[in-house]
Every structure is written in C-alpha cells, then in structure tokens.
Curated annotation (Swiss-Prot):
Keyword Cell membrane: yes
Membrane spanning residue stretches: 16-36, 42-62, 86-106, 114-134
Stored InterPro entries: Ala_export_AlaE
Gene Ontology terms: biological process: amino acid export across plasma membrane
Designated name of the protein: L-alanine exporter AlaE
Chief location category: membrane
Length: 153
C-alpha cells in the first residue's frame, strides 16, 4: 500500500478519535466539574470540533514520538506507554483547551477550574485516550510499524 494511503488513514483515524473523545469528555468536565452552563459547554464543544480537526494529526505525531522516546528508556513497556500518553495528552491539550474556553467567553475562574480539573482528570483521560486512539487506528487499518515510519517523514 502506498505511503500516502497510510498517511490518509492515519490522519482520518486520529481526527475521528480526537473529535469524538474530546466532545464527550470535554462536555462532562465542563458541566459536572466546572459548573459551566449547558449552553457554554455546547458552545465550547462545537468550537472544539474544527480545532480538534486541525490539531488531531499533529497531536497523534506528537504522542507517537513521546511514546517511542519513553519506550526506549523503560523496561515496563505498558507503564511507560501509559505515562507517555498521560504526559502527551496534558501537555498538548491544556493550552488548546484554555484558548477554546476563553474564545467562548468563559471567565478566568471558569477557565482555571476547567483546565485544572481537566489536567487532573487527564491523568486518567490521557491514558484512556491513548487506548481509544489505538483502537481507532486499528479500525482504520493503520499498521503499527508504519505509523512510526510515517511520523518520521
């Protein structure tokens, strides 16, 4: 299969995974923990869709490189992968999330609570997202070995 087809599948899988996962988890955090109204949360989630479409593949590449880097250092591959997913998710998503909340008119207190809550919850969410991303990549038949090769091109 040509590298372009692998790349397109990878982009599509990463985009589908990020849009679905961030919509569901973001709305839960915003409404349950950050005390945002349904309207504010829905506005935030709708604004996040085009943002997530733009950042999905760069995040996938960022995450894959962090996972590959940390896997070189550790003997516990499962634990290292989970730690890499946690770090990648929090470090990449928190600034993007804060910008989205600011853009929809959340006040500073709501932004701090939402981003802070999300960072704490991301200790679990980032790991779960890593598994969800791998599942979506599997559904789109993105081979594991080719993802590393494509990411380095």
């Amino acid at each position: 299969m040509p590298p372009l087809l692998y790349r397109l599948r990878s982009v599509l899988a990463d985009t589908v995974a990020m849009v679905i996962y961030c919509f569901i988890t973001g709305m839960a955090v915003e409404m349950l923990l950050s005390e945002m109204t349904f309207q504010q949360s829905l506005s935030s989630r709708l604004l996040s869709i085009p943002v997530n479409i733009v950042i999905a593949w760069p995040y996938g590449l960022y995450r894959d490189r962090i996972v590959a880097l940390l896997l070189k250092w550790g003997k516990n591959k499962h634990g290292i992968r989970n730690l890499a997913d946690l770090f990648a998710y929090v470090s990449f998503q928190s600034p993007v999330y804060a910008a989205i909340l600011w853009a929809i008119g959340a006040d500073l207190s709501q932004i701090v609570r939402a981003v802070g809550s999300n960072a704490i919850i991301s200790m679990l969410m980032g790991v779960v997202y890593g598994y969800f991303l791998e599942y979506c990549r599997h559904l789109f038949r993105v081979p594991v070995l080719n993802r590393q090769r494509i990411g380095s091109n």
